[in-house]
Amino acid sequence: MEQFDCGDCDLNDFIVHDAEAYSAAKLAVTYVMYAKANAKHVAAYFSLANDRVSLIDFESKTEFNRFRRHRFPNEKRLKSYPAVKLCRLGVDLADRKLSIGTFILNFIKSYFTRDNRTGCRFIT
């Protein structure tokens, strides 16, 4: 992992020094994608954590109510809704032109919408 470089110092540092600690503390889970041609080369990684969408995320209560009205029946209108947060996403500079970031975003979207593994409807 020491050779991973996505062009962002904070993202590079996280995968090398912090990802395991975040996982151990149950703050975020990091997934690593290795290159097909070289199983030791980290092509990309992403971290996920639990989140929520709530009233404080909107400019006004009216905006939040409009958001809820179009998505939930009246009896399911809560003050907050479960979500999954994409905390970090880094693609190694050597692999930038391979659409790996797009692949990861589509994977996350289908993982949580098609199979609905955690009962959430939103990705933040």
Regions found by a protein language model. Give the residues of each.
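Residue-level recognition of the N-termini of beta-strands and the immediately preceding loop/turn
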Residues: 29-31, 82, 120-123
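Conserved acetyl-CoA-binding loop-helix of GNAT-fold acetyltransferases
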Residues: 97-111
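Conserved acyl-donor/pantetheine-binding loop and adjacent beta-alpha core of acyl/acetyltransferases
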Residues: 45-88
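Conserved beta-hairpin
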Residues: 26-47, 60-62
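Conserved GNAT acetyl-CoA-binding A-motif
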Residues: 105, 112-124
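A short, internal acetyl-CoA/4′-phosphopantetheine-binding micro-motif in the GNAT/acyltransferase core
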Residues: 87-97
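Short amphipathic alpha-helix that is part of the acyltransferase structural core
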Residues: 1-21, 25, 41
